[in-house]
């Protein structure tokens, strides 16, 4: 009887320690959860378009990360900082935003179709695609050449 109580108590402790950590989210192994979404940093060098295609091919509803708040921006910055593998191409990480018209104005939505509710620009010039910059600890958005291969983060 005493052993049964000990095992039950041990399971209760494990359950309580996991609640609130994101472990209760339905994220795949290797993905991190934050406020109902799952994120993963990929240490693959791809152009913006190839990175977006890679994300969508992983499963339905996956796209390059869209950042909707300062809280989410901070979460993504920490996730990238902790998971990026250092190479000469890690100065930038793609996010799901790019210019969609000939005047190079940004689209009014992220690559996943959600509206742009939060902005965190560091530069005004336009090179069509946006990413996070290591020099800002991945906290500011910078304009980048879409054809350059960089690491990226997918979100579902």
Swiss-Prot record:
Disulfide bonds join 27-38, 55-154, 129-146. It is found in: Secreted. Pfam families: Lectin_C. PROSITE patterns: C_TYPE_LECTIN_1, C_TYPE_LECTIN_2. One of its GO terms (cellular component) is extracellular region. It comes from the Eukaryota. Keywords: Disulfide bond, Hemostasis impairing toxin, Secreted, Signal, Toxin. Heterodimer; disulfide-linked. Belongs to the snaclec family. Interferes with one step of hemostasis (modulation of platelet aggregation, or coagulation cascade, for example). This is Snaclec A3. It comes from Macrovipera lebetinus (Levantine viper).
């Amino acid at each position: 009887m005493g052993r049964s109580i000990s095992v039950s108590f041990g399971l209760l402790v494990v359950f309580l320690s996991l609640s609130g950590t994101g472990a209760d989210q339905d994220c795949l192994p290797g993905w991190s959860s934050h406020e109902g979404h799952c994120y993963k940093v990929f240490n693959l060098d791809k152009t913006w378009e190839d990175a977006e295609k890679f994300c969508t091919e992983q499963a339905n509803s996956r796209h390059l990360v869209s950042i909707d708040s300062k809280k989410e921006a901070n979460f993504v910055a920490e996730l990238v900082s902790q998971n990026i593998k250092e190479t000469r191409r890690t100065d930038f990480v793609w996010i799901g935003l790019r210019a969609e018209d000939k005047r190079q104005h940004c689209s009014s939505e992220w690559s996943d179709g959600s509206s742009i509710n939060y902005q965190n620009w560091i530069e005004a010039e336009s090179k069509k695609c946006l990413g996070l910059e290591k020099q800002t600890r991945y906290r500011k958005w910078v304009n980048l050449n879409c054809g350059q291969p960089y690491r990226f983060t997918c979100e579902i």
